[in-house]
Amino acid sequence: MEAYIRQKRATPGMVQASDLQLVRPMSGVNRNGREVHAYDGPMQFMMSPTNPDQIMPTSPVGPVPTVAVGGTGPNVTATSITTTPTSPYSDSTMEKLTPSSQDSEDEESTPVDVLPLPASTKSPANGGAGGAILYDRPTVDGHHLLSHSAPISPALNNNNHTHHTNSSSGNVKSSEDSGTPPSGGGGGAPDTEGDVIGPIEQWVTQPAAQGVLYKCRITRDRKGMDRGLFPIYYLHLERDYGKKLFCLAGRKRKKSKTSNYIISCDPTDLSRQADGFVGKLRSNVFGTTFFVYDSGTKNDAAAPRLDLAVVIYDTNILGFKGPRNMTVLLPGMTEDDQRVQISSVDDQQGLLDCWKSKNMDNVVELHNKTPIWNDETQSYVLNFHGRVTQASVKNFQLVHDSDPEYIVMQFGRTADDIFTMDFRYPLCAFQAFAIALSSFDGKLACE
């Protein structure tokens, strides 16, 4: 079964990360004229002042060495490799990493980068925190992306990450910066890594702050009598030194005509009656359309159920090989960064109804970023900037058509049951987690 799964992931329909270097096995240090510059020892020391692999949040950028590996096969050249100086922290303050965190932290520590946009006309903000300067967002068909006046995507300086693919030779060259997240506004300041503010129950439903990147991890638990068919998914917010904070858990209901996931802040009680119940994800019969609702009830006039997202997967009845195509609909944002309340309880007023009738005034439409075919690997590739390490049909990045370099969300596999999930404004943790769960669910008309 494991060999079959590995063979399936190697099919052309899988989406691979384009920023991974090709690893070729070598039986000796020097053979056939090869010369490898490396140090003999484990690839991750314990946290100590002499740890060459340690990455501190405030580490300055060191000199720019160049490492070249010669021989047959494609050439891979890395420049601007950062070196970490002696840690200013003492050994007593460092947390001892577990083997599992050591294996996955190095490849998942680089945040998502975005590319610069053309200069936009500045307009002062009337709302938002701290009187921040807002920029006029580009429009599509006369409609703004987030609101009447929303901040433009982060802009990068000349030293930030860019990725190029040479289609003629297949050689891939990557030039990376120190791993600092890109700016969340027009001032050039880098994105800060987000953390939980306030109670978990409230934070998971609040839209992400502008200029903040939230890096999360989803684990799938398939242990137990019935978890092979009904696994439990856990969402954790990643922190420094391999630490993580539990945020949400989700599981498919057993007795339901369609796929129906209960999402809760309490991992021990995944039911609608639980105090930690946040909302649910429900699909249609064919598994092509998924609806994300909050914790409200359908027939409650005082607190009606709100539509938080709709995920639409393009049908693939003929079975063509290739990545999935998906459309995500979100409620629009006001000038004070709050969601517009949209409810499908009212006839023809839900997110899907507005999208079908082309009434997009209060709706944000996102699409998955189109992967690029790589002739060398014979697969579709996307640049996940080190956050995704395994090919999977589930890997995707969400962008808006007017700003395709501002990655609102990305999701991908790093192990058999471990996935990374990063999201930004205007998504919240609950919306992003529900969108990721829709990728796990089986789709009769999409595979």
From Swiss-Prot:
Cited InterPro entries: Tubby-like_C, Tubby_C, Tubby_C_CS
Keyword annotations from UniProtKB, A to Z: Cytoplasm, Nucleus
Chain residue ranges for the region called Disordered: 71-196
The keyword Cytoplasm is annotated on this UniProt entry: yes
Chain intervals with Low complexity compositional bias: 71-92, 157-169
Biological process, per Gene Ontology: protein localization to cilium
Compartments, as annotated in UniProt: Cytoplasm; Nucleus
A Pfam family per the record: Tub
One GO cellular component term noted in the UniProt record for this chain: nucleus
Family: Belongs to the TUB family.
PANTHER family according to UniProt: PROTEIN KING TUBBY (PTHR16517:SF7), TUBBY-RELATED (PTHR16517)
Record's protein name: Protein king tubby
